Amino acid sequence: MKHKYLIAVSGGPDSMALLNKKRHLVEAVCHVNYHDREDSDNDEKIVRDYCKKYNLKLFVFDTHKDDVSKYKDINNLQTWYREIRYDFFEKISQELGIKKILIAHQKNDFLESAYMSLNKNKKNLFLGIRRKSKFRSLILIRPLLNKTKKSLEQYCRSKNIEFVIDYTNFWDRYSRNVVRKMMAEWDKKTFQKFYLKVKWFNLKNMFFIKLLDSKFNNWIKQDFDINYFLKIKNNYKESLIYLFLNHIGIKPNENKIEQIIEFINKNKNGSVKKYRLKENQFIEIKNKKILYSIC
């Protein structure tokens, strides 16, 4: 099905603007009702009404109606949201045979992510959010990274598109919200200065990133053969494991990356041992290949 996409729509201004701009390319709309606010049903209604108006196919995951028992051991709320969301997107993707999904991350989200990465003193090759990335079997496409949240709200108002503002975005419960509130106080000059700093950082690393992507794609083609990995220069290995974890839908961190490299080095001759990624998810080495499993 050429040029057809799924789209994730929350009912907020970003995703409603994206839906309106790209609806001619959309095969189906995906909405998750987490029931995390008293008025979350209103978000769903806004999305339903829009889809009905333009005769768009809509799929809804409702945490009060659909089975969420598999997520009961997840203690971090943001991780809980993320796992539910992407499992749902992947399910619809497989049902419809469409791998590409439009995501409404915008310029503010991009800079918030960049700021948080810099604050963690991580070994960064790329700051912010990529326009296109792969997550499990999904291809995520973010067309709005050059648009500010304010401009998207203005767009919705100019087109009389109904949207909802999620008041939990202003709670200090989450570190991203603290960064969001801080950046909201920046003037245009400070905002643009930081944006250019991030873009320049990414531009400087572009050659290395492209080379790394090429090596990772070759590794995928070789079914994650450990001999291929072991021959790679050490300065690429951490980044390859980072991409591997993203590829299988596991959130990377430096400790996990270092432990996996150590696991591969210790078990390069084959072993029945498994490395636990989280809860019931593991990797093991069999026939010189890294295998991912859910038990």
Curated annotation (Swiss-Prot):
One cellular component term from this protein's GO annotations in UniProt: cytoplasm
Binding site for ATP: S10, G11, G12, P13, D14, S15
Gene3D superfamilies linked to this entry: HUPs
Major subcellular location class: cytoplasm
Keywords: ATP-binding, Cytoplasm, Ligase, Nucleotide-binding, tRNA processing
SUPFAM superfamilies xref list: Adenine nucleotide alpha hydrolases-like
Catalytic activity: cytidine(34) in tRNA(Ile2) + L-lysine + ATP = lysidine(34) in tRNA(Ile2) + AMP + diphosphate + H(+)
MF annotations from Gene Ontology: ATP binding; tRNA(Ile)-lysidine synthase activity
EC number in record: 6.3.4.19
Cellular compartments annotated: Cytoplasm
InterPro entries: Rossmann-like_a/b/a_fold, TilS/TtcA_N, tRNA_Ile_lys_synt, tRNA_Ile_lys_synt_N
Function: Ligates lysine onto the cytidine present at position 34 of the AUA codon-specific tRNA(Ile) that contains the anticodon CAU, in an ATP-dependent manner. Cytidine is converted to lysidine, thus changing the amino acid specificity of the tRNA from methionine to isoleucine.
Domain notes: The N-terminal region contains the highly conserved SGGXDS motif, predicted to be a P-loop motif involved in ATP binding.
Protein name: tRNA(Ile)-lysidine synthase
Organism: Malacoplasma penetrans (strain HF-2)
Gene that encodes the chain: tilS
